Amino acid sequence: LSQRSKLTVVGAQMVLVNTVKERVNLMKNRKTYAELQSELMKRYPQGVTSGGVSVDDIIQLKIQNTYDTHLDIARDMAGVMRADMAAYDENPENFTQSLGCWSGFHAQQMIRSVKRLRGTTKGAYVYLSGWMVAGLRNRWGHLPDQSMHEKTAVADLINEIYTSLRQADEVELNDLFKALSAAREAGDIAAEKAAIQAIDNFESHVVPIIADIDAGFGNEHATYLLAKELIKAGACCLQIENQVSDAKQCGHQDGKVTVPREDFIEKLRACRLAFEELGVDDGVIVARTDSLGAGLTQKVPVSMEPGDLASEYIKWLEVEPITDTSPAREGEMLLSLNGEIVRPVRLPNGLFAFKENTGRARVVEDCIASLTQGGADLLWIETATPDVEEIAGMVNEIRKVVPNAKLTYNNSPSFNWTLNLRKQVRQGWINEGKISETDYPDGNALMSAEFDDTELGREADARLARFQHDISTKAGVFHNLITLPTFHLTAKGMDELSNGYFGEDRMLAYVGTIQREEIRRGISAVKHQHEVGSDLGDTFKEMVGGDRALKAGGAKNTMNQFDAA
């Protein structure tokens, strides 16, 4: 390397070390090796308990237990999110990301991968999708995203995710303590100091979870009770939507029904009270609005004075005039709007309709009310397509009232990303006069693989690659997430493996598509016994039994074949 390149590498390493230290410092319950050693030696001056347990072993177990309770996790991760939000306010390129995970193992492997890639977990979260809980993690099979699954499933998954992330801490710290023991046995003081420094600077795999609480699973009190369970499981961030709880739909399906803003604000307050009661003072609330695609409301709120929340909600209702030819009927609801008596359009199921093309205006008002009266910290605007300009336009209006408004954005698998981006490029180029309408087909034909290596296909892919950067720097998106990637990844991965394994490739299908790639990419799970804690068991057996320990990691363990990996 040139001297300039060496300086660049050293500088990058210093930034990484400082970043990791910042993350470690945010974990308030962590003590250093020396601090624990000092405390324990005061209790056990001989370096061993009366029962023969080594102080060194106690130190190891205390450090490996990175969190005593999941409520401690919620408190610390809320601080992490707040710090990240402040960093975004200073520079919108400091956006954060997450992937939706439907098991603890998915979350663990995601964060392990992030640490291998970046050397830190900074900016990486876990998203817990209500859709995937409904579709994959409930007792009644695969259900649609309509709040039909049991409430406890969400808290159970949060608990599972953090158990898996904490076990990843244990496994890696156990390896560091092995290095410390080896250094001491060899009398290598420099290696011993390096091992202790690595232990003290270890960055936990524990990261913030954004937990989907749907529409609250009931009234405001039910929302509060469920929120407490999610927080106690470790959630520092709750995402709640303004749909009717018992009529809830996936945000990318039709038939969505919203609640009046007063009702939604009460649920936001319920979440805040849950955080405050449990001592998670920095807890983060994401207020999601589905109004852009929702054309119905379940009830009409009561307006007490002009300009209040109810009147601002009612003004968007589809109404019909009362006339001689269309008089009021017995038992019919009537409204006084703009000095006229009108009837709100009501469906046979009792729901009320909004005027066409009012979704955007309702979204802006929803967001302002959630931030200014509901105490929400972040917004979520559910959209039908991935369009930076559309989101930016709404955010700019919101920021006229709340200048630091920030969003979480769903980079949803419900979007046909290839088709949408290619359509956007095509239309943009036509508007600019760069191409004519006949140069590329319109509609679904743009999905054809024949356009992959065309100028349009390459430009669409380039926009895909920078989409999250663009939406964060231009449209106020603090957090980018993909809701269902592990659902689709599992489906695609099993299809790929099954086609080869049950086809002609058989074992080559497994080795070629999985094991060889694991080895060459340094994926730790290739040593699957080690990944699930086999070495932890051996270490503990040594702690209590010494030379009598019957260990699994001996010479005959076939995992040794992967030592070169």
Regions found by a protein language model. Give the residues of each.
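Histidine-centered beta-alpha loop that forms part of the nucleotide-sugar donor binding/catalytic region
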Residues: 243, 412, 535
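C-terminal extensions of enzymes
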Residues: 23-57, 521-565
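Conserved alpha/beta catalytic core and glycan-binding cleft of carbohydrate-active enzymes
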Residues: 429-556
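Short beta-alpha junction loops
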Residues: 411-416, 486
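N-terminal amphipathic/basic-hydrophobic helices that include classical n-h-c signal peptides
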Residues: 1-26
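Short alpha-helical interface elements
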Residues: 143, 186, 255, 296, ...
